[in-house]
Amino acid sequence: MKLLLLLSFAIFLSSCVAPSPEPGIGEAISWNELPGWKNDRHAEAWPALLEQCKVLPKKKPAWANICNKAESTGKVNDETARLFFEAAFTAHRINPSKKEDGSPGTGLVTGYYEPLLNGSLYRSAQYRYPLYAVPDDLLRVDLAGLYPELSKMKLRGRVEGKKIVAYHDRSSIDNEDSPLRGKELVWIDDPVAVFFLHIQGSGRILMDDGSMLAVGYADQNGLPYTSIGKILIERGEIAREDISLFTIQQWLQQNPQQAQALLEENRSYIFFSIRENAEENPRGSLNVPLTPSRSIAVDPANIPLGSPVWLDTSYPHEADHSLQHLTFAQDTGGAIKGYARADMFWGNGDMAEKLAGEMKQAAELYVLLPGVGSKPSR
């Protein structure tokens, strides 16, 4: 009898466990529920807000009043900036996407940066790996007019006879008989550096004449991104806990005979344009200069571009060194998919490379949406 009662009680308790919340943007919460909210240097985030206010009201009318107030506020300190955000926005917890097996997921923050490469305008034995401009035959198809439900899909391809077919993949483009001959922007001295520039999306190039050239993302061939890091983990080449930009680079350098075949498994290919101002930070998908540690890339299908996003995470290899930071969703990336998923821009230089290359942190994300609803912080 006692056993039956204990069993019944256990079943009762299990039925009382709250189900994990559905992925997506949750209900409004108070500012006091944002971990570390009052401790951030909110004034440091202010320039990123002003940058996006140059373009956002035209794209999203709800931002017009916010930007008018921000631009007329003048100089701010940490407290006045924080109070501005509290008055203009409502905080919402972002519930992570579920894992492939349907179990509750966790948030993830990685990092990216602006690498420095070596290049030349002319091909030579040293500089023989090209960056390509957008090809003339790259077709972009807007399906929104015919199929509104597909308005968020970006279809790219090329015309072959009377059919639209997939655009050339990495294997075809990197071939000696590349179909893109004549569209080279610049020649680089290292194929691995070229590949990782595709992942970072923008970079600076020290030219052989001593000048500096800056390039940025212009378009993509339309084929899905495949993570070579994930492939190396699945093949047992690198342990999951050791995977990083640096361990992948090291593997490629130590396995030159297998390197090209591995790179070609990522069929996605990025095309570039020359940035007018080599000193300005690269522009993200929102078309504003990115701010180091304050700009993030997100999945725009889940987090609206331009949204302030509060991150509760940690620095790489320093789980006890919290990183609780106000950022802005100003960019996108082929590998950035899901709800509680972000890629932090760290800028350029050695420290930016180190932080971006090692960052793979569990995180909680909170999005700030226009409108008053959250209780003020005390």
What are the roles of these predicted feature ranges?
Residues L4-S14:
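Bacterial N-terminal signal peptides
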Residues M1-L4, R378:
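Short, Lys/Arg-enriched, disordered terminal segments
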Residues L6, G24, P104-T106, H198, ...:
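A generic structural signal for short, non-catalytic loop/turn and secondary-structure boundary residues
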Residues C16-P19, E27, P35-P47, A278-R378:
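C-terminal soluble interaction/assembly domains
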Residues I25-E276:
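Secretory/export targeting leaders with adjacent low-complexity proregions
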Residues L3-L4, I199, S295:
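Hydrophobic alpha-helical segments and their boundary regions
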